């Protein structure tokens, strides 16, 4: 999002999450919602931590955004990995908050990232029309469309994937903690942890790839994200 906004010439204000606060979004986020803002991006669950934002805080943020005519873009691309995503998603608030935009993806839960298939939810039809008119004419490939239609019939797969990833995530977290690493309680298909500096480069030599998170705002060398497979 930072790259896209920068390319459009937007002024960007960051809100780095803090280790001493568990890398959780805090109530003081609302203090940063000033009248000079047009758009706010939040990721729920967060990437790279996998932590979710409490609904009470999200509603408070939504109210503040609505009062100041700020659009809130909520990235829920990893929400399907939660045991009960319907209890966390803000999809039920779309009619109440026309300033709410929700991003969802097929590519995460259905494990087909190369096809690049996702969608936007919003109750502001005029805004959706303006967004549609600014997009490329052929923005979704036919293979992606066919894969998306097929994926909609895979309810059993989604259920099995959630259960398997939940089980493997708990095992992987326990094993990383046994190795002396600090691991946060992710709800997604990855784990965020703190370890020795240079760990990603050393593991790569052994054929193991993890995400070095040192280029995330507020993070330094020694923070990593590992996929749960």
Label each residue range with its predicted role:
Residues 1-10, 138:
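Substrate-binding/gating loop at the entrance of the active-site cleft, primarily
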Residues 14-16, 39-46, 72-76, 184-186:
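Short beta-strands and strand-loop turn motifs
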Residues 14, 74, 102, 210-212:
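Hydrophobic residues in well-ordered beta-strands that form the structural core
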Residues 19, 165-166, 170, 174-207:
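Conserved PLP-binding catalytic core of the aspartate aminotransferase-like
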Residues 123, 192-196, 206-229:
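Conserved PLP-binding active-site segment of the aspartate aminotransferase-like
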Residues 99-184:
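PLP-dependent aminotransferase class I/II
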Residues 6, 23-36, 48-72, 76-109:
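Active-site pre-lysine segment of PLP-dependent enzymes
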């Amino acid at each position: 999002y930072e790259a896209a906004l920068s390319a459009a010439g937007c002024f960007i204000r960051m809100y780095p999450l803090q280790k001493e606060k568990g890398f959780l979004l805090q109530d003081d986020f609302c203090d940063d919602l000033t009248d000079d803002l047009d758009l706010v991006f939040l990721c729920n669950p967060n990437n790279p931590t996998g932590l979710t934002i409490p609904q009470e805080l999200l509603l408070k943020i939504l109210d503040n955004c609505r009062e100041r005519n700020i659009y809130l873009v909520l990235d829920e691309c990893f929400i399907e990995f939660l045991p009960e995503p319907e209890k966390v998603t803000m999809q039920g608030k779309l009619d109440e908050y026309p300033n709410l935009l929700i991003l969802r993806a097929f590519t995460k839960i259905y494990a087909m990232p190369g096809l690049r298939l996702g969608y936007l939810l919003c109750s502001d039809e005029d805004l959706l029309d303006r967004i549609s008119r600014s997009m490329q004419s052929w923005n979704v490939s036919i293979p992606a469309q066919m894969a998306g239609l097929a994926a909609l019939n895979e309810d059993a797969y989604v259920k099995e994937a959630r259960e398997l990833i939940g089980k493997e995530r708990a095992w992987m977290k326990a094993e990383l903690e046994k190795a002396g690493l600090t691991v946060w309680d992710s709800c997604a298909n990855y784990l965020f942890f703190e370890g020795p500096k240079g760990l990603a480069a050393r593991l790569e030599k052994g054929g193991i790839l993890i995400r070095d998170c040192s280029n995330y705002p507020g993070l330094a060398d020694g923070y990593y994200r590992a996929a749960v497979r």
